[in-house]
Amino acid sequence: MENVIKYMFNGYEATVIRPENPNGKWIWKTEFLYAFDDAERELLSRGYTRVYYSISNKYGSYHAVRLMHDFYRHVIKEFELDDKCILFGFSRGGLYAFNFALFYPECVSKIYLDAPVLDMRTWPPEGSENREQVYKEYDLTPETIKTFKGHPVENFAEFFSHGIPLYLIAGDSDEIVPFEYNAGKMLDYCFDNGIRIKNYIKSRCKHHPHSLYDVKSIIEFVEE
């Protein structure tokens, strides 16, 4: 029987879902803990601990990454977890997963990105509350965001230099997080630079649904 543990850490809610027989390995989903989680539920049944730290509306900012690292150090000790996590970054959660791995690659064993936001110039949309939150969190303006070098798409070289195994899943008709400028741009970079990553591009698929109807390839990626 799984055990769901909720508590506050540094002012933000943490959720740790412990399997009946934990194996020390853990999935850290950076946003939307229970959304499209067939793969996570299967992995839980195989002994993986599921972890979520609710620091929403920080969009993977430098502040968010520092909070994540503090939480990481706490959670591996408190729950006797492996010192490398497996990051799952869905949509805006891709910002957190990418940036945490960028700054703390030694803390990450694998990354699964699903329809990730990799360029904040393309999402959130201008005029939205989310966009205003991005400006505040990153200390940006409508002008400075255009030349900001902290977008994940500006940091592919350093990110891929760490050699962290990556699985990228996205829909090629994403109407919310434009494929061409986000997941598509990552694929183009990998192709142009001879970098091999596991990927599954869903033809004529929009932003939703995330994940896959058959999550076998996700399970295999995590366990291989």
Where are these regions (language model features)?
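N-terminal cap/lid segment of alpha/beta-hydrolase-fold proteins
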Residues: M1-N21
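Short beta-strand element of the alpha/beta-hydrolase
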Residues: N23-F32
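Alpha/beta-hydrolase active-site loop
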Residues: Y59-E80
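Alpha/beta-hydrolase fold nucleophile elbow
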Residues: F79-S91
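Glycine-rich nucleophile elbow surrounding the catalytic serine of serine-hydrolase chemistry
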Residues: G89-N99
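Hydrolase active-site cap/lid region
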Residues: N99-T144
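The feature captures the conserved acid-bearing segment of alpha/beta-hydrolase catalytic domains
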Residues: E132-F191
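C-terminal catalytic histidine-bearing segment of alpha/beta-hydrolase fold enzymes
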Residues: I176, E180-E224
